[in-house]
């Protein structure tokens, strides 16, 4: 196959990823961002990492699983930089959820405030669980067993409950 064909195939696959998975990428970045600037930076980092590693996708898992893994790893890697800039207003305070009732909006803001306090791996687990991702797929994304996924999610939910009662 010619270099031109490989390049065309790579670009087509990347365009497809961007078109189909932008909401997923945005959701993961939102969970790790502390400000709107961090959110935008994370999205750019994720897209750059997807572009550079797209040739490494070998169909051993679903495309969405691979994208989640790249997104989460990128966000965790960048979280130290974001913590240094924690004086910014939190993203949950900056972004408005337009189509929600005031009560529901406040519940969502409180949930995101609590999730922001979790460590990066806990954030990834709870985000995937909230997204309705199957335990098997969460295990593939996080590199842990299905049983361990259940145990860790239970612990994170307990931790969030305790944090909300403080």
PLM feature segments, named:
Residues 22, 26, 47, 119, ...:
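C-terminal flanking helix
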Residues 2-27, 40:
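A short, charge-rich alpha-helical start-of-domain segment used by transcription regulators
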Residues 72, 142-166:
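DNA-recognition helix of helix-turn-helix
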Residues 56-58, 69-89, 104:
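Arg/Lys-rich amphipathic alpha helix in sigma70-family domain 2
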Residues 46, 70, 125-126, 138-139, ...:
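Hydrophobic positions on the alpha-helical face of helix-turn-helix-like DNA-binding modules
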Residues 96-127, 131-143, 161:
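Amphipathic alpha-helical segment used for protein-protein interaction
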């Amino acid at each position: 196959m010619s270099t031109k064909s490989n390049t065309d195939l790579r670009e087509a696959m990347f365009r497809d990823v961007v078109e189909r998975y932008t909401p997923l990428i945005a959701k993961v970045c939102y969970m790790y961002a502390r400000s709107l600037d961090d959110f935008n930076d994370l999205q750019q980092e994720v897209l750059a990492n997807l572009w550079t590693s797209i040739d490494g996708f070998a169909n051993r898992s679903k495309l969405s699983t691979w994208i989640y893994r790249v997104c989460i790893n990128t966000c965790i890697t960048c979280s130290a930089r974001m913590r240094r800039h924690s004086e910014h207003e939190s993203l949950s305070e900056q972004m408005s959820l337009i189509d929600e009732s005031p009560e529901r909006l406040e519940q969502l803001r409180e949930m995101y405030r609590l999730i922001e306090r979790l460590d990066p791996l806990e954030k990834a687990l709870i985000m995937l669980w909230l997204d309705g991702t199957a335990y098997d797929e969460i295990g593939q994304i996080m590199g842990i067993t299905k049983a361990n996924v259940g145990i860790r999610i239970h612990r994170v939910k307990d931790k969030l409950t305790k944090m909300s009662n403080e």
